[in-house]
Amino acid sequence: MINEKKDLEDIIGLSLDKLYEKDIYLIKAGENIKKLVNADVLHNSERSIVHRFAYYFEELYKEKYKDHNLNIDVEYNRNLYDIKRLGEDCIIPDFIFHERGKNKNNILVIEFKTWWNSEQAEDKEKIKKLCEEKEYQYQYGASIIFGKSREEVDIKWYPFDE
């Protein structure tokens, strides 16, 4: 089973490579639209980009590891049989790699931002809490900003250097 940071870094890197190779339109469509119409930049949703990243992550994970008891979920708000919460607030992480219905295999939580909306303070706080809270204890947390190109992608791992 995958549980080493290096393995996660490799799969994340390869997933980003595939995303930028096959789905660059999702990331750069706003720029193209701005050239065609006289309007503010109209970008695709972060969710659509994260969905494709998750698709590639799962594909690569299943290819490399034969134990398929872990799940990749996008915008997942469940905690066992309840809603995922931090204090009183309902939370919905962008991407989690875990075993559904259990909290013992919470491997990775990622929050994403896009180059046109890159404010990360709230996301970093959410990751910190999901990694530290006894109820969740994700082994790893990361914040990823999708850049205009693959080379511009910014990945920060928890604990964050401030």
Descriptions of predicted regions:
Residues D67-N103:
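Active-site metal-binding core of divalent-cation-utilizing nuclease and nuclease-like domains
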